[in-house]
Amino acid sequence: MKAEKLAAIIDSDFYTGVPDSQLKALCNYLMGTYGIDPKHHIIAANEGNCVALAAGYHLATGKIPVVYMQNSGEGNIINPVASLLNDKVYGIPMVFII
């Protein structure tokens, strides 16, 4: 699937992530479309920061954000996912591309 089609299906206007060679097509699409505009695309230092940024975006806008990462970054999202996204805490919806 092409990155443009994936983005159209997801229909989000906020992406944050840690670039990865396996996600090169998506990263290139996001850079070409949004660049590093903090209203739409933020490249973060680690995956846990991405989840926190996306959670803040949702709390501020009510919209569903997207987090992209390589599979080795899953361990870095455990704490923010368990605390911020849990339905008994804030119940924040989020799309993950791994």
What are these regions (language model features)?
Residues 1-98:
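Thiamine diphosphate
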